[in-house]
């Protein structure tokens, strides 16, 4: 088996304020290992922004700008246009490929920042958008987002005898972005770092708008021990709850197919946000995932 050689350079410094076992920090570290120093980051308000930039400190060793919840993609669009103008009018960076990358959580991407993201994709800006998906507004107190999974409990979708947690299915952001007709979209998970890094490398080699949705388990919001972050992510993929695939120029491809999908029960039972589920609830979720996987060819 050929193992990918990870770059030794670190452009995401240690010492951030993230929780022990934080998945968002892994997203940033792996992303920058591929993107390298010639990168400009726009970062929406959220966990990653708050934990990496407590004034006057920063974990970012590349140019970085904090944006509001709603405009990371719009800011990246402006930076991309400015870089093009500087190259054209002043000859600056003429011999360099500058990577413009926007990063936002699921709340800042699928909800509050969706309009700006859709506009940036539709206009064809040469940017990469990374959605780090921890499936709720974790920074502000674990409120539900449109990326919160069906029946997961949050502070605004609590579980009780009548309401079984979140009552809506998780928004399929990657397929929504694919519907924009952009050249590259993909899903990834921090528990499969080689898959994620290959997708980042491919995305940055393609001209035009790109989108990658990265599942990153959250020890605080999901309710599991910090040392289980990678295991939880693997179970999300092995059960088919979060499939790994890419769509390049309209061509769909599964990038990891479990030899035999594990029961969703193994994934759900490890997390406190699902502790209210009955056997009937779990069977309902299993049926939904089975149908989804059949549609994708898993």
UniProtKB/Swiss-Prot annotation:
InterPro entries: PorB-like (IPR051479), THDP-binding (IPR029061), TPP_enzyme_TPP-bd (IPR011766). Its EC number is 1.2.7.1. It comes from the Archaea. It is an enzyme of class 1 (oxidoreductase). Binds 1 [4Fe-4S] cluster per subunit. [4Fe-4S] cluster binds at residues 19, 22, 47, 218. It catalyses: 2 oxidized [2Fe-2S]-[ferredoxin] + pyruvate + CoA = 2 reduced [2Fe-2S]-[ferredoxin] + acetyl-CoA + CO2 + H(+). GO terms for molecular function: 4 iron, 4 sulfur cluster binding; metal ion binding; pyruvate synthase activity; thiamine pyrophosphate binding. Its cofactor is [4Fe-4S] cluster. Keywords: 4Fe-4S, Iron, Iron-sulfur, Metal-binding, Oxidoreductase. Heterotetramer of one alpha, one beta, one delta and one gamma chain. PANTHER family: PYRUVATE SYNTHASE SUBUNIT PORB (PTHR42897:SF2). This is Pyruvate synthase subunit PorB. It comes from Methanocaldococcus jannaschii (strain ATCC 43067 / DSM 2661 / JAL-1 / JCM 10045 / NBRC 100440) (Methanococcus jannaschii). The lineage of its organism: Archaea, Methanobacteriati, Methanobacteriota, Methanomada group, Methanococci. The gene is porB.
